[in-house]
Structures are given as structure tokens and as C-alpha cells.
């Protein structure tokens, strides 16, 4: 491709790594088309008070994990800090553990960007392995990743060719998104406040340094959790001795946790898991998996 913009800035939030994996897929695809790419974690920008230098990018991208059919609170907090976009071309992508309702309406994210002067021309859902409720089987995890690679390449080509692709949002889906998102924001604070560490905690401090909202502290030799949690699950799944657990909603935690890159690179794991013949819960995944 020739004549397309060459500098891309991708700003993303990733709790347990799935949105980062999609970000890496998109960054690689842009680079294959001759673009220069910066991929920047928004939680690191927020924690370190780093200003957004949007003027250096021809195109800006924003990625987030779906929380209760919407972007998490920390993502919207970041959007409020953006400089004026001056009608900059923008794309949005989101990762979800299920294709149900396309991960919710994009109206609220699109509106927040529009108010800052950014024009959203492309939106995409990427279904990735779930990080709550159900531990997907390795073949499905690999199939979802490979599908994300294919969809990522298509998204990048459409962006560079100025082919618009916006998610169709119904009034119902937008209402559901707004309602569930409000409940999730409250629930996240409750969930975080009620985390605790078991006796296997070795006070390594990884959870403290990794927390995107500085919700975890060490006080008098003990790990303490507060009420700024964004429900990303990062502390639970990145704890080396698996010492962090919720007092309530324990059924949300997947055991054992999966290593995405290890599964993807394992040649013994096949990726042909869901087909048109699939029945049961995962049947509704087939339409997503068969789309470009």
C-alpha cells in the first residue's frame, strides 16, 4: 500500500493480557504495511502522569477489554485527559471473552472520543479467551488467537485504505451497556475491597507495582486492598504463589490460569475446535469465527 499515513499511536488498557495481545497483533500488521507504531499502556501513562503527545501520530487507536458490555472506568478516565484531537482519524478495538451482543454498544466510547475531537472510523471486536467464569480449552484459545490475527490484518488494511467499519449499535444495546456498566463500576470497588491474601503470600510486591489503579498497598507488613479496583483481575492471575483471592464471587476466578503465548506456540495444540457442527454453549461463537 502506498500513500497512507505512516505513524500510528495505539493506546490500550489490558488487565490480564488479552487486549495487549490484540494490540501486538495490530502493531505487527501496521508494521508489515510500512508504518511506524507506538503501543502505549494507558495505565502506565496515568500512574506516571505522562502527557499524551497526539500530534506525532497520523492515526490514533484505542483498545480496551470489555467490562459489563462497556469499557472499564480507567479507560474513560484516560479519554478525559486526551488533548484536542483536531478531527484526527481514530480506530477503536475491544477484547471480550464472548461475542454476545458484540461486547456491548460502542456509543459511549465513540461519544467520549467525539467530544475530544476524534473521528472514529473503524471499530472491531476481538473475542479472546475468557478471564472469568470458564477456562476455555487450549484448542479454542488457539483458534480465537488465530482468528484475532486474521481479523487484525483485515482491520489494518481497511484503516489504511480509509474503509469505514463502525459497529451497529441499537438503542437496546446502548441501554444495556449503560445500565450494566454503572453496576459494574460499583461492583468493581466492592470486589477490590474484598480481596485478601492467603498465608502463601511472600510479600513480593508484584501485585502492588502491577495494579493499574494503585489499589493495593503494604501496611505494617500486610497486603491491603482498597476501593479503587477496576476489576481487571491482574493481581489475581499475576501473583506467583496464587495467594490473592476474593472473599466473595470466588467462582469468577479461573483455575488453572492459562499462558496464551505458550498455547499459541505449542504445535501439538490444534486450532480447529469450533465448526458449523458445534453444539451447546459455544455454538454462537461460529459466526464470529467465520467472519473476516
Where are these regions (language model features)?
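FMN-binding flavodoxin-like domain, especially the glycine-rich phosphate-binding loop
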Residues: 2-8, 16-22, 27-42, 50-64, ...
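Local sequence-structure signature of Cys/Sec-based thiol-disulfide redox active-site neighborhoods
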Residues: 8-13, 197
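Conserved active-site "lid/cap" helical segment
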Residues: 46
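Short beta-strand or tight-loop elements
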Residues: 193
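Iron-sulfur cluster-binding cysteine motifs and their immediate structural context
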Residues: 196-197, 202-224, 230, 234-251
Amino acid at each position: 500500500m502506498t500513500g497512507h499515513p505512516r505513524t500510528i499511536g495505539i493506546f490500550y488498557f489490558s488487565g490480564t493480557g488479552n487486549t495487549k495481545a490484540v494490540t501486538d497483533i495490530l502493531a505487527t500488521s501496521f508494521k508489515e504495511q510500512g508504518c511506524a507504531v507506538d503501543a502505549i499502556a494507558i495505565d502506565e501513562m496515568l500512574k506516571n502522569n505522562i502527557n499524551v503527545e497526539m500530534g506525532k501520530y497520523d492515526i490514533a487507536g484505542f483498545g480496551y477489554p470489555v467490562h459489563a458490555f462497556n469499557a472499564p472506568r480507567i479507560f474513560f478516565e484516560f479519554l478525559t485527559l486526551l488533548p484536542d484531537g483536531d478531527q484526527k482519524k481514530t480506530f477503536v478495538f475491544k477484547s471480550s471473552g464472548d461475542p454476545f451482543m458484540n461486547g456491548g454498544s460502542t456509543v459511549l466510547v465513540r461519544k467520549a472520543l467525539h467530544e475530544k475531537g476524534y473521528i472514529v472510523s473503524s471499530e472491531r471486536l476481538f473475542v479472546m479467551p475468557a478471564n472469568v467464569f470458564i477456562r476455555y480449552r487450549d484448542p479454542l484459545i488457539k483458534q480465537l488467537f488465530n482468528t484475532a490475527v486474521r481479523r487484525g490484518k483485515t482491520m489494518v488494511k481497511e484503516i489504511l485504505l480509509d474503509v469505514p467499519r463502525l459497529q451497529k449499535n441499537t438503542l437496546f444495546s446502548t441501554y444495556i451497556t449503560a445500565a450494566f456498566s454503572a453496576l459494574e463500576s460499583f461492583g468493581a470497588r466492592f470486589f477490590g475491597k474484598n480481596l485478601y491474601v492467603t498465608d502463601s503470600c511472600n510479600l513480593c510486591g508484584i501485585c502492588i507495582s502491577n495494579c493499574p489503579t494503585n489499589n493495593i498497598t503494604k501496611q505494617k507488613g500486610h497486603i491491603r486492598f482498597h476501593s479503587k479496583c477496576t476489576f481487571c483481575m491482574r493481581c489475581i492471575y499475576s501473583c506467583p504463589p496464587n495467594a490473592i483471592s476474593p472473599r466473595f464471587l470466588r467462582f469468577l476466578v479461573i483455575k488453572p490460569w492459562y499462558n496464551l503465548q505458550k498455547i499459541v506456540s505449542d504445535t501439538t495444540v490444534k486450532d480447529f475446535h469450533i465448526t458449523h457442527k458445534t453444539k451447546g454453549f459455544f455454538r454462537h461463537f461460529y459466526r464470529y469465527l467465520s467472519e473476516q
